[in-house]
Amino acid sequence: MASNKVIGIDLGTTNSAVAVMEGGKPKIITNPDGSRTTPSVVAFKNGEIQVGEVAKRQEITNPNTVRSIKSHMGEEGYTVDIDGKKYTPQQISAMILQYIKGYAEDYLGDTVSEAVITVPAYFNDAQRQATKDAGKIAGLDVKRIINEPTAAALAYGLDKQDKDEKILVYDLGGGTFDVSVLELGDGVFQVLSTNGDTHLGGDDFDQRIIDYLVAEFKKENGVDLAQDKMALQRLKDAAEKAKKELSGVNQTEISLPFIASNDNGPLHLQTTLTRAKFNELTHDLVEKTKIPFENALKDAGLSTSDIDEVILNGGSTRIPAVQEAVKEWSGKEPNHSINPDEAVALGAAVQGGVLTGDVKDVVLLDVTPLSLGIETMGGVMTKLIEKNTTIPTSKSQTFSTAADNQTAVDIHVLQGERPMAADNKSLGRFQLTDIPAAPRGIPQIEVTFDIDKNGIVNVSAKDKGTGKEQKITIKDSNGLSDEEIEKMMNEAKANEEADKKKKEEVDLNNEVDQLIFQTDKTLKDVEGKVSEDEIKGVKDAEEELKKAKADGNLDDMKAKKDTLNEKVQAVAVKLYQQQQSQGGEAGAANGDASKKDDNTVDGDFHEVHDDDKK
């Protein structure tokens, strides 16, 4: 039976998390490692797909390890090549989602089929569609795609519905950056504006440390570590660790022994990185977040004095220089009441609760982050829907032909803020044909844009004269067809079955090893106390099981395991009965002794151990 719960998933660049509503509150579900977040890392090893911490641990040694795949969602033509097979970002993301879905099901004790998944507010249509496709491949019906800052605001404001507040969410994650301004009041969470950069995050801060270490090492030793893949991976791990440590201390040691070698022998990287140096290396990255910060306020028609609370979200907001900058720009001490690693998943769970009716009196009004329009004469982008328009929404505009007797029009759909079509993101093209021949400017072509609650775009074009209509759901050129998604779903299901079988195999092997160990122990205990035939029967069954284990036939192993188990139990029971019988005889003898006359002299006694009997 499927659970009626809608889980909330924060599908992050660096880490992911999942939450569910319980008792009217969102709760993070821990993964099998006991952690509240899961590294967004996938590794392929010996035909097995591994996700999370186990995958992250082998980044240095396993070249078939994929991280930060979110940075490539919706990217045209991007694939990952693993052992000659190409995987799209949607497929890799689906593997992460499948793993999360699995441990959420273990926690809930039910199958999970529905989810709310979060995306950066500044994700375009192609990136949103790719995220939805990833969910579908993983076997999830994605009920809603919501923006990460909005989700963080839901987590913050769930128990503050009686307040009227304007809040600014500054969200700096592993690979993306967003700023959203929201108004909260009477259970309504209304997004006023959003801005950001989908290619700016903690990974960039790590890279600055890596570049610095590479340059310093080359200067000292004449060796370029950037050319050595394994050394580079060790540097990545060290940079991430140093960045985190510098959030709590003023300096940290970076020690990487045997990082390289030259004619004189092995070389070691040993250095101290101070917070001041780290701030110097990353100052421009922090400053890069200022323009979206200011634009979000400007688009909302507000100044910093109008903002009641500034919420920090995303692991990278733990960087002291980031916190100081936000405090300086906003003139307010940022609110630290929500966990920046968990807030988005918690907010997604709240939205899941809204959809199932578990959460009452909460309304979420989000916006489209970028303007939408079509290309018109002269290569101009004509906007139909302006950025920061509340969604869902629909807008129509009438256009005409550009030439006499034109019988078809090409509709080129665009997303962005630039005046010229070529400078914006192309979402797709379609054609309206069979327009009756007429002088230019006479045919009336009505173009309608619909944006659904997930921020996904549908466009239609209608000839008002004939009533003929053509419509499409926008798919990026790297988007997946329904057939491709179906195929990937089947592959994901097959992988899930293979993973399940692999786990069963490991569990069975462990049970067999444990039984063999127990058998050997039991045989020692019963030596000389049961018949030789019984002992031979156990030993023969044990050898049969060992042979089945060596052959790797799971069904045979199960059968032989059950047989051996029965025989071991039988001799163990017999030994127990013998001991009981001996105990009874000893008790009877003691009873007879107690019937002797009362002229008994008390004497000293000592306990007789088995060793004393020998």
UniProtKB/Swiss-Prot annotation:
One Pfam family, short name: HSP70
Family affiliation: Belongs to the heat shock protein 70 family.
Q: What are the Basic and acidic residues biased-composition ranges?
A: 593-614
A molecular function (GO) held by this record is: ATP binding
Residue segments, region Disordered: 576-614
Induction, per UniProt? By stress conditions e.g. heat shock.
The name this protein goes by in its record: Chaperone protein DnaK
According to the UniProt record, list the residues that bear Phosphothreonine: T176
What role does it play?
Answer: Acts as a chaperone.
Q: Which UniProt keywords apply?
A: ATP-binding, Chaperone, Nucleotide-binding, Phosphoprotein, Stress response
Residues spanning the membrane:
none
Comp. bias intervals (Low complexity): 577-589
Report whether Nucleotide-binding shows up as a keyword of the record: yes
Gene3D superfamilies on file? 1.20.1270.10, 3.30.420.40, Actin, Chain A, domain 4, Substrate Binding Domain Of DNAk, Chain A, domain 1
User: Which NCBIfam families does this chain map to?
Assistant: PRK00290.1, prok_dnaK
Supply the InterPro entries for this chain.
Answer: ATPase_NBD, Chaperone_DnaK, Heat_shock_70_CS, HSP70_C_sf, HSP70_peptide-bd_sf, Hsp_70_fam
